[in-house]
């Protein structure tokens, strides 16, 4: 089968690779679309992979073309996506409470094992999420990041709260859409790219340009959601959260941080709550994936407008380099990228 293979750091190749044997409780998925996650860029270009060679891709959808001998829950031709995290124990306290994303013994499609940037992928029955036929395939591959946005949202409880989103990438935009759909109105969003801010779902949401010094922000907020994940964004969050406020950290961090004693003391003096959020939940109650599917069905056109680039699997190699080097431009020669999806023929 055809696959985009990360041979080593900064070395991606389109190759013919052997298909893996289908295990008894797996389904062979013919991949329709794969989303490129922001984490895939450092994985490919900043020595972020756990092992090589690797087929990346953890945001995907497709059709079941073959069922393992003991795979009975789904059937051939079902349209599906998949929860990419594979808990290995199912016995720890996190797994018992259905917080599978907190399990320490896990694998992960597209990260710790091969993923969906290929023609086919064998997926465990446990990980399969069946999609409604009314979900457009171009949006089916975005289930995972939208579910992550819902995992962030569940921590924001007061509709009258003042909220600041730091970072207006795809998940930040989706979170703004969720807040808008739930009638939150006191929402400010900060990003350095005007074209991203232009996609906000509500004209009343305040747009903050990134080249404004973070610390020049005049307001203080009940909730700050840090989707940037650097020293400056964390320091800003500590300074700009009100007494008793909450900081939600939901970005992968790729460099060490030095946080001043003054800022650390703000956590104590202001009684701040800092919470880390990673991945999404598959709980029977409050399942982020069910929420994501319903959100897609109600907001198809807006979410489609967030897909800035679509490339074929055969031509997918160069898009990674262009994103990494910020060489995706509009006619005014401004960097213009939100979300890229890879299409299989």
Model-identified regions with their sequence ranges:
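Glycine-rich beta-strand-centered segment in the early N-terminal region that forms part
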Residues: 20-34, 47-93, 127, 132-134
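N-terminal Rossmann-like NAD(P) cofactor-binding module of classical short-chain dehydrogenase/reductase
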Residues: 81, 224-225
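NAD(P)H dinucleotide-binding glycine-rich loop of Rossmann-like/cofactor-binding domains
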Residues: 88-166
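Mid-domain Rossmann-like dinucleotide-binding core that forms the NAD(H)/NADP(H) cofactor-binding site
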Residues: 136-211
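A short acidic, Gly/Pro-enriched loop at the edge of an enzyme's catalytic core
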Residues: 215-224
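Glycine-rich phosphate-binding loop and adjacent beta-alpha segment
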Residues: 232-298, 344-345
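C-terminal hydrophobic helical "lid"/dimerization subdomain
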Residues: 287-345
């Amino acid at each position: 089968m055809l696959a985009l293979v990360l041979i080593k750091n900064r070395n991606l190749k389109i190759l013919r690779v052997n298909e893996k044997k289908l295990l008894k409780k797996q389904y062979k998925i013919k991949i329709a679309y794969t989303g490129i996650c922001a984490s895939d860029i450092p994985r490919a270009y900043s020595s972020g992979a756990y092992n090589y060679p690797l087929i990346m891709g953890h945001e995907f959808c497709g059709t079941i073309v073959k069922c393992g001998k003991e795979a009975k829950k789904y059937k051939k031709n079902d349209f599906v996506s998949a929860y990419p995290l594979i808990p290995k124990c199912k016995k720890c306290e996190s797994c018992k409470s259905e917080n599978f994303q907190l399990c320490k013994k896990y694998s992960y499609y597209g990260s710790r094992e091969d993923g969906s940037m290929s023609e086919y992928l064998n997926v465990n029955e446990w990980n399969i999420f069946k999609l409604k036929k009314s979900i457009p395939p171009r949006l089916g591959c975005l289930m995972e990041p939208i579910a992550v946005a819902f995992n962030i949202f569940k921590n924001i409880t007061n509709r009258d709260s003042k909220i600041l989103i730091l970072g207006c990438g795809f998940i930040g935009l989706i979170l703004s859409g969720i807040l808008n759909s739930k009638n939150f109105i006191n929402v400010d969003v900060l990003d350095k790219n005007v074209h991203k801010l232009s996609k906000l779902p509500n004209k009343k949401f305040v747009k903050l340009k990134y080249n404004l010094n973070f610390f020049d922000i005049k307001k203080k907020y009940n909730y700050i959601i840090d989707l940037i994940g650097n020293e400056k964004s964390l320091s800003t969050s500590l300074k700009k959260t009100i007494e008793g406020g909450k900081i939600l950290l939901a970005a992968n961090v790729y460099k060490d941080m030095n946080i001043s004693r003054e800022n650390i003391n703000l956590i104590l003096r202001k009684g701040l709550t800092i919470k880390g959020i990673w991945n999404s939940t598959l709980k029977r109650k409050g399942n982020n994936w069910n929420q994501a599917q319903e959100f897609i069905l109600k907001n198809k056109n807006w979410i489609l407008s967030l897909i800035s680039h679509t490339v074929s699997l055969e031509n997918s190699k160069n898009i990674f380099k262009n994103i990494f080097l910020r060489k995706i431009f509009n006619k005014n020669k401004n960097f213009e990228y939100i979300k890229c999806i890879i299409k299989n023929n």
